[in-house]
Amino acid sequence: MVDEAEVARMIKKAKEGDKRNFTQTLEFIMVFKDIDIKKGFAINETVQLPKTSSPSTVCVLASGDMGVRAKNAKADMVVDADGLEKLGTNKRESRKFINRYDFFLADTQLMPVVGKVLGQILGPRGKMPTPVAFNAPIESFLERFRSSVRVRARASLSLSCKIGDETMDDADLVANAMAVYGTVEKKLPQGSKNVRQIMVKTSMGSIVKQSGTVA
């Protein structure tokens, strides 16, 4: 396991870098070892962060009652069946649309349509929607995904994800980093033994590496 005190040191060091005229994000980076990426190694996880500064954007693909409830719950966007079919007629607009949102939730009844019209674009981006049953509490799903980040590595021995921004307390950023680490570690063939290095950096800052190795 990685030491929380070491993660705290790295975050503190990263935040001490030069200030910019905008709020910089904090990125948590993991580098792996002893994994054969040719054997299909991939990570695509959704991690709910204990603390957040700005919510992730969530689009709901639903019609009828679920669509209404999603709108009432202030989903960033709600697209019904007709809207999906329309998106499917323009791939360029579909790509632009998909890039606007971090996560997608979809009524299970619409999943066949989603796969047909947007699957070829959503799939490679690791953004295939999470299915939601018609009678499920879409409000709870929205709350969870707004405080989540996507952690993804595909044919690569490293990954990077946002854990917050420089305005957040160090302790909150540490909690977020540990949540990401814990989720990824469980997906590695040999757990922490497959972690070569962890690093932290701000948007425009230098990379801060850990001291020693993860054991």
Swiss-Prot record:
Entry's Gene Ontology cellular component terms: large ribosomal subunit
Keyword terms: Repressor, Ribonucleoprotein, Ribosomal protein, RNA-binding, rRNA-binding, Translation regulation, tRNA-binding
Organism of provenance: Cenarchaeum symbiosum (strain A)
Protein name in UniProt: Large ribosomal subunit protein uL1
GO biological process, one term: regulation of translation
Cited function: Binds directly to 23S rRNA. Probably involved in E site tRNA release.
GO function term, MF aspect, one: tRNA binding
Source species, domain of life: Archaea
Family: Belongs to the universal ribosomal protein uL1 family.
Family annotation (Gene3D superfamilies): 3.30.190.20, 3.40.50.790
Subunit note: Part of the 50S ribosomal subunit.
